[in-house]
Amino acid sequence: MVKRREFLKAAGVSAVAMGRPHVLNVAQSSAPASVPGDAKYPKLAIKTRYSPQRLAFAASAGYEGVVVDLDDFFDPDKLSDNQIDQILATVRDTGVRIISIECMLNHLAPDSVERRQTRARFIRCLELAHRLGCKFVGTFSGGKKGASVDEQVKELAEVLNEQYLPVCEKLDLGIGPENYPCDVNFATVPATWEKVMALVPSHRFGLEFDPSHLVRQYIDPIQTAWDFRDRILAVHAKDTEIIQPVLAKVGIHGKGWWRYRIPGQGLIDWPKFITVLLQAGFHGGVAVEHEDEFWDVPQGDDGPEMAQERKDGFILAARFLRQYLPGRLS
């Protein structure tokens, strides 16, 4: 009998995830850069603020890592050497590693002073990530109001090639933008990624791939993941629900017709999506990004401890995703 992992190495994603008869040898495609850890499988993580309590919760819920957002404490310009040592001690004590950090900055800020400061700050984020043992830093692509897509592509490629990627090479890091559509993140769709990657061939630059943002734009996340499989360096695990009765009344430019959900409670076909990752040899972080109001509390998520309702969402997400991720299975 062919075992599951042997099958994943031999069978093409088109047979498993795309419903087609064609078989593709995964060895033909380049594997993306890894995130820390010797085991060659995706690491299930949560995206969260830093606190010892949150790392302890992640461990208790069966997660292997955390992806940490910058905040007033967790900041490369504020953390002392002693505080960094304490963070690393917490990582050792909990057994939950910091897989990556999130530095959502505007690398194309219109003001030259702000732009210079932002780029210097991002390099300090890279240095902090390296000290914490990370192999990836997530960010935005940036945005400049009034500039064309091609102009923004050219400027982003310049800062990547000339400033960021030499540092990444030195520190053994990958970087990439999350595909969240907003004013300071112009590169959020496949056509734009192709333009940027044509000018930035280094595979230390890739994507922090979030399929939920594609669903609400009616872009197929499975096909897109396969098309960019060798440039996916990190994953946000978040689902999207389309509320058809509302959409039928307000249209795509209206509000309230979609909402983010925890994995398994929206439209994404997670077995197919994760099959793409496994076929591609992805062994970075799959971080649950919890923006599901159904499994949360109105007052937000500011304290060192999560509310139990929010924890419940992460626990359910872990139970669901673990079905499809090899993880610590023997």
Q: Over which residues does each language-model region extend?
A:
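Glycine-rich, proline-tolerant flexible connector loops at the mouths of alpha/beta enzymes
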Residues: D69-L88, K144-A147
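N-terminal secretory signal peptides and thylakoid transit peptides that target proteins
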Residues: M1-A15
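Conserved, mostly hydrophobic/aromatic
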Residues: A58, V66, V91, A129, ...
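Active-site beta-loop-alpha junctions enriched in small/polar residues
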Residues: R49-S51, D71, C103-N106, G142-K144, ...
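Active-site acidic/histidine proton-transfer and metal-coordination neighborhood
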Residues: A11-R20, P32-P36, T48, P52-A59, ...
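Hydrophobic faces of well-ordered beta-strands that scaffold small-molecule active sites
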Residues: P42-T48, V66-V68, I98-C103, V137-T139, ...
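C-terminal helical cap(s) of enzyme catalytic domains, especially alpha/beta-barrels
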Residues: P304-L329
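Acidic/histidine-rich catalytic cores of soluble enzymes
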Residues: V66, I101, E162-L267, P271
